[in-house]
Protein backbone atom coordinates (compact mmCIF):
# COMPACT_ATOMS: atom_id res chain seq x y z
CA UNK A 1 0.00 0.00 0.00
CA UNK A 2 1.54 3.33 -1.00
CA UNK A 3 2.21 6.18 1.38
CA UNK A 4 0.22 9.22 0.18
CA UNK A 5 0.80 12.81 1.26
CA UNK A 6 -1.73 15.35 0.04
CA UNK A 7 -1.55 19.02 0.93
CA UNK A 8 -2.95 22.16 -0.68
CA UNK A 9 0.36 22.43 -2.56
CA UNK A 10 1.27 18.88 -3.59
CA UNK A 11 0.13 15.31 -3.85
CA UNK A 12 2.82 12.66 -3.46
CA UNK A 13 2.41 8.87 -3.55
CA UNK A 14 5.33 6.57 -2.73
CA UNK A 15 5.48 2.80 -2.66
CA UNK A 16 8.87 1.21 -2.02
CA UNK A 17 9.98 -2.41 -2.11
CA UNK A 18 13.27 -4.22 -2.18
CA UNK A 19 14.27 -4.65 -5.81
CA UNK A 20 12.10 -4.64 -8.89
CA UNK A 21 11.17 -1.95 -11.34
CA UNK A 22 11.25 1.70 -10.40
CA UNK A 23 9.11 4.54 -11.77
CA UNK A 24 9.67 8.12 -10.64
CA UNK A 25 7.68 11.11 -11.83
CA UNK A 26 7.91 14.63 -10.41
CA UNK A 27 7.44 18.10 -11.93
CA UNK A 28 11.14 18.84 -11.25
CA UNK A 29 13.40 17.05 -13.79
CA UNK A 30 16.56 17.12 -11.65
CA UNK A 31 14.64 15.87 -8.59
CA UNK A 32 13.28 12.99 -10.70
CA UNK A 33 16.82 12.15 -11.84
CA UNK A 34 18.20 12.30 -8.28
CA UNK A 35 15.38 10.14 -6.86
CA UNK A 36 15.90 7.55 -9.60
CA UNK A 37 19.60 7.56 -8.77
CA UNK A 38 19.13 7.33 -4.99
CA UNK A 39 16.56 4.54 -5.10
CA UNK A 40 18.29 2.51 -7.83
CA UNK A 41 21.62 2.61 -5.98
CA UNK A 42 19.78 1.66 -2.77
CA UNK A 43 18.41 -1.43 -4.52
CA UNK A 44 14.82 -0.27 -4.12
CA UNK A 45 11.97 -0.53 -6.59
CA UNK A 46 8.49 0.90 -6.59
CA UNK A 47 6.77 4.12 -7.55
CA UNK A 48 7.25 7.77 -6.64
CA UNK A 49 4.71 10.15 -8.16
CA UNK A 50 4.52 13.81 -7.24
CA UNK A 51 2.12 16.43 -8.56
CA UNK A 52 2.39 20.14 -7.82
CA UNK A 53 -1.10 21.48 -7.14
CA UNK A 54 -0.11 25.09 -6.51
CA UNK A 55 2.56 26.40 -8.87
CA UNK A 56 5.04 28.43 -6.83
CA UNK A 57 8.05 28.04 -9.16
CA UNK A 58 10.59 27.53 -6.37
CA UNK A 59 10.37 23.75 -5.96
CA UNK A 60 10.41 23.97 -2.17
CA UNK A 61 7.08 22.27 -1.44
CA UNK A 62 7.54 19.50 -3.99
CA UNK A 63 11.06 18.67 -2.80
CA UNK A 64 10.08 18.78 0.87
CA UNK A 65 6.90 16.72 0.43
CA UNK A 66 8.71 14.13 -1.69
CA UNK A 67 11.37 13.80 1.04
CA UNK A 68 8.63 13.38 3.67
CA UNK A 69 6.84 10.72 1.63
CA UNK A 70 9.99 8.80 0.65
CA UNK A 71 11.22 8.90 4.25
CA UNK A 72 7.92 7.61 5.62
CA UNK A 73 7.74 4.89 2.95
CA UNK A 74 11.30 3.82 3.84
CA UNK A 75 10.40 3.77 7.54
CA UNK A 76 7.36 1.59 6.76
CA UNK A 77 9.51 -0.74 4.64
CA UNK A 78 11.84 -1.23 7.60
CA UNK A 79 8.95 -2.27 9.91
CA UNK A 80 10.64 -3.24 13.20
CA UNK A 81 14.13 -2.84 11.67
CA UNK A 82 15.10 -6.43 12.48
CA UNK A 83 17.18 -8.48 10.09
CA UNK A 84 19.04 -5.58 8.47
CA UNK A 85 22.71 -4.70 8.70
CA UNK A 86 21.64 -1.28 10.05
CA UNK A 87 24.83 0.61 9.12
CA UNK A 88 26.11 1.51 5.68
CA UNK A 89 28.67 3.78 4.09
CA UNK A 90 30.01 4.58 0.65
CA UNK A 91 32.50 6.85 -1.07
CA UNK A 92 31.66 7.90 -4.63
CA UNK A 93 33.90 9.89 -6.96
CA UNK A 94 32.33 11.69 -9.91
CA UNK A 95 34.93 13.41 -12.02
CA UNK A 96 36.39 16.19 -9.82
CA UNK A 97 33.92 15.58 -6.97
CA UNK A 98 34.04 13.04 -4.18
CA UNK A 99 31.31 12.28 -1.67
CA UNK A 100 31.20 10.16 1.46
CA UNK A 101 27.85 9.07 2.86
CA UNK A 102 27.12 7.06 6.00
CA UNK A 103 23.77 5.92 7.39
CA UNK A 104 22.39 4.28 10.51
CA UNK A 105 18.88 2.86 10.15
CA UNK A 106 18.66 2.26 13.90
CA UNK A 107 15.56 4.42 14.36
CA UNK A 108 17.15 7.70 15.48
CA UNK A 109 16.92 10.74 13.24
CA UNK A 110 19.95 12.95 12.76
CA UNK A 111 21.65 14.50 9.76
CA UNK A 112 24.85 16.25 8.80
CA UNK A 113 25.43 17.66 5.33
CA UNK A 114 28.75 19.29 4.51
CA UNK A 115 28.54 20.36 0.89
CA UNK A 116 29.30 23.87 -0.28
CA UNK A 117 26.74 24.47 -2.99
CA UNK A 118 26.10 27.69 -4.89
CA UNK A 119 22.60 29.16 -4.83
CA UNK A 120 21.76 27.92 -8.32
CA UNK A 121 18.92 25.90 -9.80
CA UNK A 122 19.55 22.82 -11.92
CA UNK A 123 16.64 21.33 -13.84
CA UNK A 124 14.12 23.13 -11.62
CA UNK A 125 15.88 22.02 -8.39
CA UNK A 126 17.26 24.87 -6.25
CA UNK A 127 20.42 23.32 -4.80
CA UNK A 128 19.91 25.23 -1.55
CA UNK A 129 17.16 22.63 -0.95
CA UNK A 130 19.55 19.65 -0.97
CA UNK A 131 20.46 19.84 2.76
CA UNK A 132 16.76 20.31 3.56
CA UNK A 133 15.89 17.24 1.47
CA UNK A 134 18.45 15.15 3.40
CA UNK A 135 17.27 16.49 6.77
CA UNK A 136 13.63 15.77 5.98
CA UNK A 137 14.45 12.30 4.66
CA UNK A 138 16.45 11.51 7.82
CA UNK A 139 13.69 12.71 10.15
CA UNK A 140 10.89 10.85 8.37
CA UNK A 141 12.88 7.62 7.84
CA UNK A 142 14.15 7.78 11.44
CA UNK A 143 17.69 7.46 10.11
CA UNK A 144 21.01 9.11 10.79
CA UNK A 145 22.54 10.41 7.55
CA UNK A 146 25.95 12.01 7.10
CA UNK A 147 27.06 13.41 3.74
CA UNK A 148 30.40 15.07 3.08
CA UNK A 149 31.00 16.41 -0.44
CA UNK A 150 33.96 18.09 -2.11
CA UNK A 151 34.36 19.26 -5.65
CA UNK A 152 33.76 22.19 -7.95
CA UNK A 153 30.80 21.14 -10.11
CA UNK A 154 27.57 21.39 -8.09
CA UNK A 155 25.76 18.91 -10.35
CA UNK A 156 28.51 16.34 -9.79
CA UNK A 157 28.51 16.89 -6.02
CA UNK A 158 24.75 16.46 -5.67
CA UNK A 159 24.57 13.49 -8.04
CA UNK A 160 27.51 11.76 -6.34
CA UNK A 161 25.81 12.43 -2.99
CA UNK A 162 22.65 10.63 -4.13
CA UNK A 163 24.74 7.72 -5.44
CA UNK A 164 26.75 7.49 -2.22
CA UNK A 165 23.64 7.72 -0.05
CA UNK A 166 21.94 5.08 -2.18
CA UNK A 167 24.90 2.70 -1.85
CA UNK A 168 25.07 3.32 1.90
CA UNK A 169 21.35 2.56 2.18
CA UNK A 170 21.79 -0.62 0.13
CA UNK A 171 24.46 -1.77 2.56
CA UNK A 172 22.39 -0.83 5.63
CA UNK A 173 19.31 -2.59 4.20
CA UNK A 174 21.21 -5.79 3.46
CA UNK A 175 20.51 -8.82 5.66
CA UNK A 176 22.25 -8.65 9.01
CA UNK A 177 21.79 -8.77 12.73
CA UNK A 178 21.22 -5.03 13.28
CA UNK A 179 23.75 -4.71 16.05
CA UNK A 180 22.53 -3.00 19.21
CA UNK A 181 23.78 -3.16 22.78
CA UNK A 182 20.22 -2.25 23.89
CA UNK A 183 18.71 -5.33 22.28
CA UNK A 184 16.31 -3.21 20.20
CA UNK A 185 16.57 -0.64 17.44
CA UNK A 186 14.85 2.70 17.74
From Swiss-Prot:
Which chemical reaction does it catalyze? D-erythro-1-(imidazol-4-yl)glycerol 3-phosphate = 3-(imidazol-4-yl)-2-oxopropyl phosphate + H2O
The cellular location(s) given in this protein's UniProt record come to: Cytoplasm
Gene Ontology terms for molecular function: imidazoleglycerol-phosphate dehydratase activity
**Which spans are transmembrane here?**
none
Q: Does the keyword Ligase apply?
A: no
Please provide the Gene Ontology terms (biological process) for this protein: L-histidine biosynthetic process
* Class of this enzyme: lyase
**InterPro entries assigned:** IGPD_sf (IPR038494), ImidazoleglycerolP_deHydtase (IPR000807), ImidazoleglycerP_deHydtase_CS (IPR020565), Ribosomal_Su5_D2-typ_SF (IPR020568)
| Signal peptide segment | none
State the UniProt keywords alphabetically: Amino-acid biosynthesis, Cytoplasm, Histidine biosynthesis, Lyase
Q: Which Gene3D superfamilies match?
A: Imidazole glycerol phosphate dehydratase, domain 1 (3.30.230.40)
Q: Which GO terms describe its cellular component?
A: cytoplasm
Recorded E.C. number(s)? Answer: 4.2.1.19
Q: In which pathway does it act?
A: Amino-acid biosynthesis; L-histidine biosynthesis; L-histidine from 5-phospho-alpha-D-ribose 1-diphosphate: step 6/9
Q: Which family does it belong to?
A: Belongs to the imidazoleglycerol-phosphate dehydratase family.
HAMAP family according to UniProt:
HisB (MF_00076)
Q: Which PANTHER family match?
A: IMIDAZOLEGLYCEROL-PHOSPHATE DEHYDRATASE, IMIDAZOLEGLYCEROL-PHOSPHATE DEHYDRATASE HIS7
- Official protein name in the record: Imidazoleglycerol-phosphate dehydratase
Origin organism is Pyrobaculum aerophilum (strain ATCC 51768 / DSM 7523 / JCM 9630 / CIP 104966 / NBRC 100827 / IM2)
Amino acid sequence: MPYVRKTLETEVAVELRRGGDLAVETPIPFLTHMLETLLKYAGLGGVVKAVELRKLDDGHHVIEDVAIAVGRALDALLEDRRGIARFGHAVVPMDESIVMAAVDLGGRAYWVVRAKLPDVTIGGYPLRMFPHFVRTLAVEAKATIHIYARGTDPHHKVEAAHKALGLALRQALSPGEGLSTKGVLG
